[in-house]
């Protein structure tokens, strides 16, 4: 079994409370932007790079930073997922907000589309259940509802 360390970002627009998802070509599902952490790359760097590569957006990661200035932002969570071949993906998940006002667009071959969704719209599209659970958590913790 291979272990792949990944980083991803749940991006919420603070004004509209919508989440940005990418349509993953292989899975044919809407997922948060993210991907494998490269050698000599921190999880934060990988998360920011993957978001930019997949959507063209620059984001700011939100979360507690431990006391020392060069410590990392505490991730929203860490998730284990096994794929059909039995490989394990360990995903370090962050919460982020956009810092530029460009319209996101699919930039990588892995994704076919990029779109903002309201929480209600998530019930009408093909997403993994944890996407809804995580969005509900972010809306409650950061936006009071």
Name what the model sees in each region.
Residues 21-23:
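Short, acidic/hydrophobic/Gly-rich beta-strand patch recurrent on exposed beta strands
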Residues 31-35:
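A short gly/proline-enriched turn/hairpin at secondary-structure junctions
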Residues 3-5, 30, 87-88, 115:
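Residues that recognize and position ribonucleotide moieties
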Residues 27-29, 122:
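A short, flexible beta-alpha/helix-coil linker loop
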Residues 123-145:
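Charged phosphate-binding loop/patch that engages nucleotide di/tri-phosphates or the phosphate backbone
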Residues 1-19, 92-95:
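Conserved N-terminal beta-strand and adjoining loop/helix that marks the start
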